A protein has these predicted regions:
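Conserved nucleotide-sugar phosphate-binding/catalytic loop shared by glycosyltransferases and other
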Residues: 28-79, 83-85, 262
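Conserved nucleotide-sugar donor-interacting segment of glycosyltransferase catalytic cores
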Residues: 89-158
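A nucleotide-sugar donor-handling region in carbohydrate enzymes
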Residues: 135-222, 245-248
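A short, glycine/small-residue-rich beta-strand->loop->alpha-helix junction that serves as a flexible
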Residues: 7-18, 221-222
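C-terminal amphipathic helix plus adjacent low-complexity
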Residues: 341-379
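Donor-nucleotide binding loops and adjacent catalytic segments primarily
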Residues: 23, 178, 193-281, 333
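A donor-sugar binding/catalytic signature common to diverse glycosyltransferases
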Residues: 271-315
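Nucleotide-activated donor-dependent transferases that construct or modify glycoconjugates
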Residues: 1-12, 102-104
Length: 379
């Protein structure tokens, strides 16, 4: 199969990370994959083995996902959006994919709906129409009004052959965060969680005995980092390593540094996952990929869900993890250095949680589902 995955990450890098993991699973089974990314470059993420196409990049203005900024930080104008659409159209015509996958859309990225509609209409007009799938995480941002769900249903009905829900239905079903109509239910395929291969310990033991603080690969998390810098003063027996994401990480590290704190600050690093099994504990938000890393590694963890701008996705996910051993959840608004230290002491003294019981092979299952649906379409 020739597969095109289209993704635009606007704040963090989780959507791109998941799209790349999904793409690698297709490659590993002998298929050709192109990932078209419309977000800003994320050098900490590997694109090895994939064809990678960078569109003119966009990012959100903080948590305002309706206000999109271009590569220079200005509000993206019509010409910029037109350049993105033209880039995608040229790529589609060149590749003539067998399978087209849109990450998150039409359940999100409404601010890019003209771009996606143009792509989907062009795909329908190809000499051989591709199988069209939507790829979504376990928990979505619930629609703020019924029309948003109705619009998504209309797009699914018009253009899509299936919806890949990257969740284990024993843990979380789509209706936890999104109204599932009869039409949508008929196109949903649960894949299990899309996770990279199981976490393997760092060959040099990096992170051993440390408290690792992270907030994903985007430019958020300064309040969490600052709290950790101060909390490190109260727990000097542990090395606190704070991994700062975003393209401006170096500047923010300078701003966050406190010479009276023993905390170590450095940019987010690509070997972060391999450090987790060695760590004494993790302090992080609760994005999809972070949650899977923690479930796979078994590392004790304090979760501080990202909840700015009416975001509820991470809070819902954290709530589902809270009953498991070795997890504590602290609301961002209530977080203080003292509360963070208390939560860390709690999770580090908790019983070791089992690494079994969750389906982590969602990428492989997605390939199988796509192949089956394509075979049925072309039979």
């Amino acid at each position: 199969m020739n597969v095109l995955i289209v993704v635009t990450h606007l704040l963090g890098t989780g959507h791109l990370s998941r799209a790349l993991t999904l793409g690698r699973a297709f490659v590993e089974t002998g298929h050709h994959v192109t990932v078209a990314s419309g977000g800003f470059p994320a050098p900490q993420l590997s694109t090895h083995g994939l064809a990678f196409e960078q569109l003119p990049p966009l990012r959100s203005d903080g948590v305002d996902f309706a206000r999109l900024l271009d590569k220079d930080g200005a509000v993206a104008d019509d010409a910029y959006h037109s350049a993105r659409r033209n880039h995608l159209s040229t790529l589609l015509q060149s590749l003539q994919p067998d399978v087209l996958i849109t990450e998150l859309y039409p359940f999100g990225r409404r601010s890019l709906r003209a771009e996606f509609r143009a792509l989907l209409e062009a795909a329908q007009a190809l000499p051989r129409r591709p199988l069209v799938l939507s790829s979504i995480r376990d928990i979505l941002a619930p629609p703020s009004k019924p029309k948003k769900a109705e619009d998504a249903d209309a797009m699914i009905a018009e253009f899509y052959d299936g919806v890949l829900v990257h969740s284990d239905p024993k843990a979380t079903t789509l209706d936890t965060s999104w109204p599932v109509s009869d039409l949508l239910a008929g196109k949903v395929h649960y894949t299990g969680y899309v996770a990279p291969p199981a976490v393997t310990p760092h060959p040099e033991g990096a992170g051993k005995g440390e408290i690792l603080v992270s907030a994903g690969g985007g430019g958020v998390g300064d309040a969490l980092y600052d709290c950790a810098v101060q909390a490190a003063k109260a727990m000097p027996d542990h090395i606190w390593r704070i991994l700062v994401g975003g393209s401006d990480a170096t500047t923010r590290i300078t701003q966050l540094s406190d010479p009276t704190s023993p905390a170590l600050l450095e940019p987010a690093r690509p070997d972060f996952r391999t450090m987790l099994p060695h760590a004494a504990a993790s302090v992080s938000m609760c994005g999809y990929n972070t949650a899977l890393d923690l479930l796979q590694s078994g590392t004790p963890a304090v979760l501080v869900p990202f909840d700015a701008g009416k975001e509820v996705e991470q809070s819902l996910r954290a709530r589902s993890l809270a009953p498991l051993p070795g997890f504590a959840v602290e609301p961002a608004a209530a977080l203080t250095p003292d509360r963070l230290c208390a939560a860390l002491h709690q999770v580090m003294q908790d019983t070791q949680r089992s690494l079994d019981g969750f389906e982590f092979d969602g990428a492989r299952r997605s390939v199988e589902i796509a192949a089956s649906l394509l075979g049925r379409q072309r039979a």
